[in-house]
């Protein structure tokens, strides 16, 4: 990413813009690059060669991912991302050094830090778009690539919107009931498309695969995307905070609607007990109690079972798919196995 990151800060930019974008560049470095890998794999499946022409698209997508995570961090009021302080949090701390006693300072500080995060994310979106246009100006599949890319952005935004409103309704408007189908819709829009199906589709489109072939392969990968998110939800509660790069309690504090939560409140007698802790800052003892509730209610076991079923479904569909060359099937199956055993 360093090759592209260094171009994100324009020497002619205002010093305030340079400061903000330097934080974006820092956040845009040292990711897992799973989505870039899937773009490369999709391209190899289609083009059957490695001429590196997929690299700008992969870099653009990783930049889009960072941009949308910056927005996500503002929405969730998150403090840590990828093991680093979030951009808006860095500005909170920077402004705190002003040590002002004005009664309006705290509100203004938070509003300004969050606004900077939104601006930086917006800039990141269009940097990503520019990278695609400038790199593939004369490519015959540019229009199709942009259409797919924009569909991914739109679907991710829709998933994020549901993910924002659902917890609010669940916490404050009791007539609305969070059901598993709502959770699955978020997983499909916000994770499956954005993390698995979208990147692989972009690579295949760039490489020249037909719509029929792309549709058959994305069908095989859709269950994988949902399994990926369920794994994330489990790691978010039971994983190592250092490995996952965020606090274990963040899903609880943010009242996140996960499969663990949905199962517990809709299928067990632990609904009221869980709701005593959800949406609150928890002590270690209280957080361990939430973990225990998910276990004794059967939610943890249910989530694992559902996740493993989806991993197996994706494996079977990949193996049966005649449009994926054997060599790339083996790589895809290895990738699925990695997602199964990952701890971050």
PLM features: residue spans?
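Conserved N-terminal diphosphate/IPP-binding helix and adjacent helical/loop segment
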Residues: 1-110, 163-181, 242-243, 334-344
């Amino acid at each position: 990413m360093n090759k592209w990151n260094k171009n994100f800060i324009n020497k002619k930019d205002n010093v305030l813009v340079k400061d903000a974008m330097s934080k974006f560049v820092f956040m845009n470095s040292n990711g897992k690059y799973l989505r870039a890998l899937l773009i490369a794999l999709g391209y190899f499946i289609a083009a059957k060669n490695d001429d590196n022409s997929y690299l700008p698209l992969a870099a653009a997508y990783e930049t889009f991912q960072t941009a949308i995570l910056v927005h996500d961090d503002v929405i969730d009021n998150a403090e840590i991302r990828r093991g680093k302080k979030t951009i808006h949090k860095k500005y909170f701390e920077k402004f705190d050094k002003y040590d002002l006693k004005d009664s309006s300072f705290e509100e203004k500080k938070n509003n300004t830090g969050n606004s900077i995060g939104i601006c930086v994310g917006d800039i990141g979106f269009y940097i990503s778009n520019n990278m695609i246009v400038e790199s593939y100006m004369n490519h015959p599949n540019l229009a199709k690539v942009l259409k797919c890319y924009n569909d991914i952005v739109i679907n991710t935004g829709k998933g994020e919107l549901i993910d924002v409103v659902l917890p609010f309704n669940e916490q404050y408007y009791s007539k609305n009931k969070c059901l598993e189908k709502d959770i699955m819709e978020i997983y499909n829009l916000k994770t499956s498309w954005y993390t698995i199906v979208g990147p692989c589709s972009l690579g295949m489109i760039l490489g020249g695969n037909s719509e029929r072939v792309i549709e058959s392969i994305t069908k095989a990968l859709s269950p994988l995307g949902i399994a990926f998110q369920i794994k994330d939800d489990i790691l978010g509660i039971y994983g190592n905070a250092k490995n996952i790069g965020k606090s274990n309690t963040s899903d609880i504090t943010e009242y996140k609607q996960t499969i663990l939560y949905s199962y517990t409140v809709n299928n067990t007698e632990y609904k009221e007990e869980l709701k005593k802790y959800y949406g609150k800052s928890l002590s270690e003892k209280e957080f361990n109690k939430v973990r225990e509730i998910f276990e004794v209610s059967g939610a943890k076991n249910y989530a694992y079972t559902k996740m493993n079923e989806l991993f197996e479904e994706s494996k079977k569909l990949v193996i049966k798919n005649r449009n994926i060359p054997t060599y790339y099937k083996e790589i895809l199956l290895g990738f699925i196995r990695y997602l199964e055993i990952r701890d971050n």
